[in-house]
């Protein structure tokens, strides 16, 4: 039997708009007395919600059933949508309601917007977000970094100032224990380092490995930052929690940077300090084949006769690990010392 339209005078009212968000629209409709649910379900009125395709201007069914409410989800923010209600009687007659138009709301400001503003170095957007008061300034991103950490790491000094003026905690640490000061020191952003220090950042903070900001600055190799840090009073011979390495030891292990090593030694770093295995900065420089740093350490008082806790010295280490250039340097140094002793006699 062919379905018949309900008389136009019996057209249903358009769906009523309920709660609207940036991604959803709630629609509901009232049952008239004649459409009360009595008897088996096949004797009930059935409802369909149809949504208009804005390009084709055709309607597609997004819900059909016996409920009197439906929430349309997965919508775009600030977008106009058009819906109509289709009511089908138990006998198969049907009618469409007038169309209802409704727009989704603006996407609410979230922590993602905060971090996006910092990532693109957008001062105006950052200020608007913070002044809106809907986002906590210290909420971390998916990597565990606060907005201040990201700004400090990238050297966005003006953003750092904005964030601090809005109450960010300069001493918060990420998942590995690094704070904004460590990140700025490693990246070499001296202006940021100075500003963080003026606003309470501490040289005494340790990451999960026990490293200080100076350890990270030594890895970064930015001499202007290291020089200022030393002048500002950070501890030159702080040891980490794992290998008990000082910043000078990290230079020997990581970069071999002579300028950084010289700055640290000039500031009083112990050239003969030992780590948990009894290794000195000289031994570590030999093992990592940092020839020029080996020369510098020897010139600055490193003791080549020291043995580690396994009884091994720098010459033996150079031979075992085939550090030929370093070995030649050490042997020549030893010969000169022998000749000097002989001439004294």
UniProtKB/Swiss-Prot annotation:
Gene Ontology BP, a term: positive regulation of DNA-binding transcription factor activity
Function (record text): Through the activation of JUN and AP-1-mediated transcription, may regulate apoptosis.
InterPro entries referenced in this protein's UniProt entry, alphabetically: Ankyrin_rpt (IPR002110), Ankyrin_rpt-contain_sf (IPR036770), FN3_dom (IPR003961), FN3_sf (IPR036116), Ig-like_fold (IPR013783)
Keyword Nucleus found: yes
PTM comment text: Polyubiquitinated. Polyubiquitination leads to proteasomal degradation.
Subcellular location: Nucleus; Cytoplasm, Cytosol; Cytoplasm, Cytoskeleton, Cilium basal body; Cell projection, Cilium
Keyword Plastid recorded: no
Entry's free-text remark on domains: The fibronectin type-III domain mediates interaction with COPS5 and RYBP.
Keywords of this entry: ANK repeat, Cell projection, Cytoplasm, Cytoskeleton, Nucleus, Repeat, Ubl conjugation
Renumbered ranges of ANK repeats: 109-139, 143-172, 176-205, 209-238, 243-273, 277-306
CC per GO annotation: ciliary basal body; cilium; cytosol; nucleus
The protein's assembly and partners: Interacts with COPS5; regulates the phosphorylation of JUN and the transcriptional activity of AP-1. Interacts with RYBP; may prevent the ubiquitin-mediated proteasomal degradation of FANK1.
Record domain Fibronectin type-III: where: 11-108
Alphabetical list of SMART domains matching this protein: ANK, FN3
Main localisation: nucleus
Matching PROSITE patterns: ANK_REP_REGION (PS50297), ANK_REPEAT (PS50088), FN3 (PS50853)
Protein name as catalogued: Fibronectin type 3 and ankyrin repeat domains protein 1
